[in-house]
Design a protein with these regions (language model features):
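Core domains of carbohydrate- and sulfate-ester-processing enzymes
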Residues: 6-39
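Conserved oxyanion/phosphate-binding beta-strand-loop segments in alpha/beta enzyme cores
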Residues: 41-43
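Structural core of flavin- and non-heme-iron oxidoreductases
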Residues: 1-6, 11, 45-48, 53-54, ...
Length: 562
């Protein structure tokens, strides 16, 4: 279900390889990660998995469904001059697509009839854990200046709704994370919507909707012809039919080139390949920076420098400590994560849709405002848990089992100042994954590092306030052997890539698409995915990406009616 990209965080190789997650390929073909690679190891970079199934990364993400701050939508409205991108209208679109299962029906700002269900984790997995309650008691005091007396009060406060309507939605505080799961604890997303549309039948058994989905297909380029006044117009898509044809696919076989096919469009072509693959497809189609395209002997359809540039992401800096004793009542302690017949957690899920495998993201969310926030709102979104650890991606990350004494906070930086990332072609072969350079901290790096450091220090204050029997703590990350900022730089990661086909004023070549998702310089072509965000929205891109898809639906439907 995933493609395994390997990305570069830094141009400086010495700095890049200080990351304990840095991955190499050995001469026998196996992957190895760590700080002291064998002599025959080929450097690959940092693992960055992406969804490679119908529904994209929303089918394998942590299901976080938090909306971004209103200021992110208003920024797009101001940048493009299009008021329909204002936060009020984007909230209306969110209401249209949401089917909220955790708030009372009719709650303002929520929808209850949409195709994306929303829910939250089991609050008892917080309130029935004395050590977790103890830590959160200090977290509320140090973050919000709230004195909490007992587990019941912790539960009440944690169930405040970060997706509610209100001016203080992104004020510092603690919350449960909203998830795109339904009342049966099942993931929801575009996959389900597409599947329901595909299988719908009329009374005579014929397909109800004219939808065809071609799986096991790799888009290679958009096809163009001369349109009005000689302006290029997209009229179709060329693709390869076959299994595992992309080099980031674990099944990839270089000798298998697939079957070349094409499909034509009666109206328009829409590219929705995500922040890595959308710019690759556009460049292979002749839409991108002229010099790069010509270096690969690709005919230039339109010189559009914004394609593949301005790659952005949320930095994440992990905080991991180990307590002196295990954190009690860990619901995951009885899971063996094998997904086999002896996995009691899987048995519980299959029988009743309950238990730890019905949980998503992390049980704890914390908003924090640093001294360098560009607005009056929080600029960091932390999520965490006791008894488990998430510290980024490396071979085998999904089966890693942390000690029961572990506690992690993942510090997600919003309002990141770095727009220096790039997606560039390695060749004109559509099967070859592009070169991905994030160029961490290349722009406004000191500011972003300062913010992350303050959030790290805030979490340590919370731990230090939580005494015995959990204290003393052993700090695992950031590595205590180096300066805090150096430790953040060494182990920082990201997995919310955006902005490689960013939206902006129509016709401006510093931007890729206009406010109606139309690609600059051509007709009949739109992009609808996270690559269009002019800056990474909030701390988690899933909900805002669902919302822009609803926006595109309205825009395209209106254009057809007109």
């Amino acid at each position: 279900m995933s493609w395994s990209f390997f990305v570069n965080h830094y141009q400086n190789e010495t700095q890049a390889r200080r990351d304990s997650k840095y991955t190499y390929r050995l001469s026998n073909g196996t992957l190895w990660y760590g700080l002291d690679p064998p002599e025959d190891a080929e450097p690959l970079g940092i693992l960055y998995p992406r969804g490679a199934t119908l529904g994209g990364s929303a089918q394998l993400n942590a299901m976080n469904f938090a909306l971004p701050p209103e200021s992110d939508w208003n920024y797009i409205a101001e940048l493009t001059g299009d008021k329909s991108w204002s936060s009020n209208n984007m909230r209306r679109l969110f209401v249209d697509l949401e089917n909220c299962t955790y708030a009372p029906e009719g709650t303002p700002g929520h929808g209850f009839d949409g195709f994306i269900a929303s829910n939250r984790n089991n609050i008892s997995y917080i309130t029935e854990r004395p050590g977790v309650v103890e830590v959160l008691t200090h977290a509320f005091r140090l973050t919000e200046d709230i004195e909490v007396e007992n587990a019941e009060e912790v539960g009440t406060l944690m169930q405040r709704d970060i997706n509610s309507i209100g001016p203080d939605r992104y004020a510092p505080g603690l919350y449960q994370l909203p998830l795109h799961i339904d009342g049966l604890r099942q993931r929801t997303g575009s996959w389900g919507y597409l599947h329901e549309t595909l299988i719908a039948k009329t009374e005579d058994g014929s397909p109800k909707y004219p939808l065809t989905i071609s799986t096991q297909s790799l888009a290679t380029r958009v096809l163009f012809k001369d349109g009005k006044d000689g302006k290029p117009r997209a009229y179709g898509v060329e693709y390869l039919k076959g299994e595992g044809l992309y080099s980031a696919d674990k099944r990839y076989n270089e000798s298998d080139s697939g079957q070349l096919m094409n499909v034509t469009a009666s109206r328009e072509v829409i590219v929705a390949g995500g922040a890595f693959n959308t710019p690759q497809i556009l460049k292979l189609s002749g839409v991108g920076p002229r010099e790069e395209l010509e270096s690969h002997d690709i005919d230039v359809v339109v010189d559009l420098p914004a394609v593949g540039n301005y790659l952005q992401d949320n930095y994440e800096g992990g905080v991991t400590v180990e307590a002196s004793i295990p954190w009690e009542n860990n619901p995951f302690a009885r899971c063996d994560f094998s997904l086999g017949p002896n996995d009691t957690c899987l048995q519980e899920w299959n029988q009743s849709h309950t238990g730890p495998y019905g949980e998503g993201a992390a049980p704890l969310g914390l908003l924090y405002k640093s001294s360098v926030s560009e607005t009056d709102e929080s600029d960091l979104f932390l999520f965490g848990a006791a008894g488990v650890v998430f510290r980024g991606y490396f071979p085998g990350y999904s089966t890693y089992q942390a000690p029961p004494t572990s506690w992690f906070w993942s510090v997600v930086k919003m309002q990141t100042g770095n727009q220096a990332g790039t997606i560039t072609l390695r060749s004109a072969d559509p099967r070859e994954a592009p070169e991905i350079n994030f160029n961490f901290f290349a722009e406004k790096g000191d500011r972003d590092l300062q913010a992350i450091q303050e959030a790290v220090e805030h979490t340590m204050q919370i731990f230090n306030a939580t005494g015995e029997p959990y204290a003393p703590y052993t700090v695992i990350e950031p590595p205590p052997s180096v300066d805090v900022r150096q430790g953040i730089m060494d182990e920082a990661f990201s997995h919310h890539a955006t902005s490689t086909c960013r939206m902006g004023p129509a016709g401006d070549k510093d931007y890729c698409v206009d406010s109606n998702f139309k690609v600059n310089g051509v007709d009949g072509l739109r992009v609808v995915d996270a690559s269009i965000f002019p800056r990474t929205p909030g701390g988690f891109p899933a909900a805002p990406t669902f919302v822009i898809s609803q926006k595109a639906f309205e825009v395209i439907l209106k254009s057809i009616k007109n």
